[in-house]
């Protein structure tokens, strides 16, 4: 079979104006970036707000292998299949970060015959949103350092500045840096560091803001650090929220592209799910719900991270809650969670599938806690065997969860028809009754304990001394009624990436709590989660090139 990039380059794209015409979007509603990419105008976004709200399908997954389990591929393929069976469907997914594209992933726009196009543009600079977020973030850093240099009227303690610079790359050498060196003319020396752009609070804000005014309000609420008297300093104190919003005025508008089969797709925003809330923008998802009968969206990593955050953080900002959750499972991930070594995942091992099913079962149970019906999608790989598939179907039947094999990577829309029909049937026969996991009025500790004990199935939460001090500060400042965004490894229910399967009765340690008032949540950091990833021994970048005619090579 052809590579992803070869498949993408073999497709004759339709002008984006033609793709979105069926949604009632005209040329005048678009801000074009060439023939095949566009942003949707705010006038059109506001015009469709009175339209009925369609059905929402959330795609999540079991705890993944390092290569991922094909959530984006399944999301795209399911939407194509829904359109194929006559359901007016849109996609709302995240934009890839260039760091992982150059690092381990090599691309993140779906795969095989379930891709959003033009995949080269989407994986690289796209419409410049990542650049705008990076620039806004670093403009704030420059303004903070300038304030220190110009006399520090606000009394900011440079030892307690929370705000870091960002770059959209995996670059471990930038995790800890010192700025302001070189004498009095070059600023005030202080410790600083870089995060990856998608970890920036501005990325989370962009994905939760509903319009320019809300964007400015959220930007003003960002806590950049503390004064010498330990009181918080915000962007509003610096009076620069207007300037930051100006940099982001186009980035906030959702991007429109198409799939191989011509399904319209919003690709907008891209926070990571292990260090942020892991969902595409509220604006894109909400607008899709007003334009289509079915919207298919995704949340990053496993359901313990992305789906929990989608349901506890993003859903309260949407006009509706998910009508169904599709949990993507692969036999290789089940075998890994069943104790098989990574180099043996392609070998038949029915017993390991049975052992690893405990992981999938827990995710199904967790989704049901939110009052939403679950459907299991087996993302088919060439190494899967009939015996393994039969065992998984039998196990799913034992817990009364619908399950379908999906071959959208190899077969495109046709390979997702059975899944699409099952999802539509599930929505019709099992109406969702959404409820949040916790009430925001609970204490910070109680909310974290609720997530750890009910979703992860841990027995106890330990708070390090630094975290205890920060909780007291959060309560003192009146921030304790915000939801919790857990920063945790994606590979395990616990904070130990090696504890695979369905561990129980473990303890989780909270080492730090970071207020993200602009985004509207408190980040609870566990384990060794990094906000600036590093590159692997052999980065995907080594396989990439561009020919003299501009043809891109090596994205996959």
Swiss-Prot record:
Amino-acid positions noted as binding ATP in the UniProt annotation, renumbered to this chain: 65-72
GO MF annotation, one: formate-tetrahydrofolate ligase activity
SUPFAM superfamilies associated with the record: P-loop containing nucleoside triphosphate hydrolases
GO terms for biological process, alphabetical: tetrahydrofolate interconversion
EC number(s) stated in the UniProt entry for this protein: 6.3.4.3
Sorted UniProt keywords: ATP-binding, Ligase, Nucleotide-binding, One-carbon metabolism
Catalytic activity: (6S)-5,6,7,8-tetrahydrofolate + formate + ATP = (6R)-10-formyltetrahydrofolate + ADP + phosphate
Domain of life assignment: Bacteria
Top class in the EC scheme: ligase
Pathway info: One-carbon metabolism; tetrahydrofolate interconversion
Similarity section: Belongs to the formate--tetrahydrofolate ligase family.
Protein name (record): Formate--tetrahydrofolate ligase
Taxonomy of the source species: Bacteria, Bacillati, Bacillota, Bacilli, Lactobacillales
């Amino acid at each position: 079979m052809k590579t992803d990039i070869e498949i993408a380059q073999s497709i004759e794209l339709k002008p984006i104006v033609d793709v979105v015409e069926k949604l009632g979007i005209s040329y005048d509603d678009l801000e074009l970036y060439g023939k095949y990419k566009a942003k949707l105008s705010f006038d059109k976004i506001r015009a469709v707000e009175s339209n009925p709200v369609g059905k929402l399908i959330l795609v999540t997954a079991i705890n993944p292998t390092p290569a991922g389990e094909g959530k984006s591929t399944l999301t795209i393929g399911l939407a194509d299949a829904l359109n194929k069976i006559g359901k007016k469907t849109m996609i709302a997914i995240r934009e890839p970060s260039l760091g992982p594209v150059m690092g381990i992933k090599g691309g993140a726009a779906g795969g095989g015959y379930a891709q959003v196009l033009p995949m080269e543009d989407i994986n690289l600079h796209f419409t410049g949103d990542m650049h705008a977020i990076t620039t806004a973030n670093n403009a704030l850093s420059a303004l903070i350092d300038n304030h220190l240099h110009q006399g520090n009227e606000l009394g900011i303690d440079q030892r307690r500045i929370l705000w870091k610079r960002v770059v959209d790359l995996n670059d471990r050498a930038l995790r800890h840096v010192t700025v302001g060196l070189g004498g009095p003319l070059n600023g005030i020396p202080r410790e600083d560091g870089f995060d990856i752009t998608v970890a920036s609070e501005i990325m989370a804000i962009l994905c939760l803001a509903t319009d320019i005014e809300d964007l400015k309000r959220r930007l003003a609420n960002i806590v950049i650090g503390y004064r010498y008297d330990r009181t918080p300093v915000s962007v509003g104190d610096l009076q620069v929220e207007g300037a930051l919003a100006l940099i982001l005025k186009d980035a906030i508008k959702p991007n429109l592209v198409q799939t191989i089969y011509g399904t319209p797709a919003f690709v907008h925003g891209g926070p990571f799910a292990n260090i942020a809330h892991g969902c595409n923008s509220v604006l894109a998802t909400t607008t899709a719900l007003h334009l289509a009968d079915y919207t298919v969206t995704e949340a990053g990593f496993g359901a313990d991270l992305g789906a929990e955050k989608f349901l506890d953080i993003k859903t309260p900002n949407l006009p509706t809650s998910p009508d169904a959750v599709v949990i993507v499972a692969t036999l290789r991930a089940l075998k890994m969670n069943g104790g098989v070594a990574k180099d043996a995942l392609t070998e038949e091992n029915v017993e390991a599938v049975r052992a690893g099913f405990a992981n999938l079962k827990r995710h199904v149970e967790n989704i049901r806690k939110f009052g939403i019906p679950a459907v299991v999608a087996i993302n088919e790989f060439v190494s899967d065997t009939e015996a393994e598939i039969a065992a998984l179907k039998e196990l799913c039947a034992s817990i009364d969860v619908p399950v379908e094999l999906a071959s959208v990577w190899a077969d495109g829309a046709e390979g997702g028809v059975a899944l699409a029909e099952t999802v539509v049937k599930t929505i019709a026969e099992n109406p969702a009754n959404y409820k949040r996991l916790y009430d925001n009025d609970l204490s910070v500790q109680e909310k974290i304990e609720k997530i750890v004990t009910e979703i992860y199935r841990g027995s106890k939460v330990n708070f390090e001394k630094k975290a205890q001090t920060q909780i007291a500060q959060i309560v003192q400042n009146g921030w304790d009624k915000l939801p919790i965004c857990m920063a945790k490894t994606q590979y395990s229910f616990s904070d130990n990436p090696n504890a695979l399967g369905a561990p129980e009765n473990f303890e989780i340690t909270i080492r730090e709590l970071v207020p993200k008032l602009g985004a509207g949540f408190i980040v609870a950091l566990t384990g060794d989660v990094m906000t600036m990833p590093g590159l692997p021994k052999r980065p995907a970048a080594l396989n990439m090139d561009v020919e003299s005619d501009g043809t891109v090579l090596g994205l996959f």
